[in-house]
């Protein structure tokens, strides 16, 4: 009689196969580790060189990152300048140079206005820059040192306008230099630019009369005295606009 035959246990066979695979992988890993250890660098000089090279590469990456951030920041500033002034800026030009260029253009427009015959009806009211005069006075009272600013240019234009209206004459308002140039006409022989002498004339008048008014009104503050000085100046013969009105 033949021997008894038994079927194969599939689960046991699968377990043995997995166990053999795990053992094989472990042996391969040990072999790789052994080979890697054989090739591992142990020379301290070479190790230091590798370390420095790694640090150099990291520094280069950090510098590149900072450079990119600075570039993006500059682009953002240029965008803001473009939105504010309506035109792109040259990244090689500083803000100081941009302001210098604007000041130069303004002076050129003023020079062009001054070189043309003017119409006394034109009153220029500046919208960008103003001229102020500062007077410092020392007294023996409680206000030992007072300093006040008068906007001479603004007052000068208002006085010219008020005096011409009071005299029944025409007045042409100009908000900037370009408008004033467009309103200019021929010269009739009279002085057409009393405003050119206004600042110097007022300074001389103030220097001469302010100490007198301070002495005559010791109880008034400097601001009040200067207001009184200004009222007197409006009627003073030294005022160039009064000289124009008498011509």
UniProtKB/Swiss-Prot annotation:
Annotated coiled-coil positions are 8-85
> Any idea what job this protein has?
Ribosome-binding protein involved in ribosome hibernation: associates with translationally inactive ribosomes and stabilizes the nonrotated conformation of the 80S ribosome, thereby promoting ribosome preservation and storage.
Q: Where is the composition biased (Basic and acidic residues)?
A: 11-114
| Matches recorded under PANTHER family | COILED-COIL DOMAIN-CONTAINING PROTEIN 124 (PTHR21680:SF0)
Protein name, as recorded = Coiled-coil domain-containing protein 124 homolog
Composition bias (Low complexity) maps to 122-140
A single Pfam family it belongs to is: Ccdc124
Q: What are the start and end residues of every segment in region (Disordered)?
A: 1-146
Q: Which GO terms describe its molecular function?
A: transcription coactivator activity
The family annotation for this protein states: Belongs to the CCDC124 family.
Q: Which GO terms describe its cellular component?
A: nucleus
Keyword Coiled coil appears in the UniProt entry:
yes
């Amino acid at each position: 009689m033949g021997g008894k035959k038994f079927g194969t246990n599939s689960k046991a066979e699968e377990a043995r196969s997995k166990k053999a695979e795990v053992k094989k992988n472990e042996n391969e890993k040990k072999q790789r580790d052994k080979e890697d250890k054989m090739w591992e660098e142990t020379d301290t000089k070479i190790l230091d060189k590798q370390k420095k090279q790694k640090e150099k590469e990291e520094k280069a990456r950090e510098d590149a990152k900072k450079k990119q951030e600075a570039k993006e920041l500059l682009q953002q500033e240029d965008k803001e300048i473009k939105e504010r002034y309506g035109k792109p800026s040259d990244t090689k030009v500083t803000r100081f140079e941009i302001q210098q260029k604007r000041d130069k253009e303004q002076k050129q427009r003023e020079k062009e206005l001054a070189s043309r015959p003017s119409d006394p009806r034109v009153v220029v009211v500046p919208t960008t820059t103003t001229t102020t005069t500062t007077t410092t006075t020392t007294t023996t009272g409680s206000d030992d040192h007072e300093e006040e600013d008068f906007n001479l240019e603004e007052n000068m234009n208002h006085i010219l306008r008020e005096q011409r209206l009071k005299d029944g004459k025409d007045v042409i308002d100009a908000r900037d230099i370009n408008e004033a140039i467009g309103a200019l006409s021929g010269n009739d022989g009279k002085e057409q630019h009393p405003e050119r002498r206004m600042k110097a004339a007022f300074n001389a008048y103030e220097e001469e009369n302010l100490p007198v008014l301070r002495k005559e009104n010791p109880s008034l503050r400097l601001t009040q005295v200067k207001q009184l000085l200004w009222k007197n100046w409006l009627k003073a013969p030294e005022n160039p606009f009064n000289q124009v009105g008498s011509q």
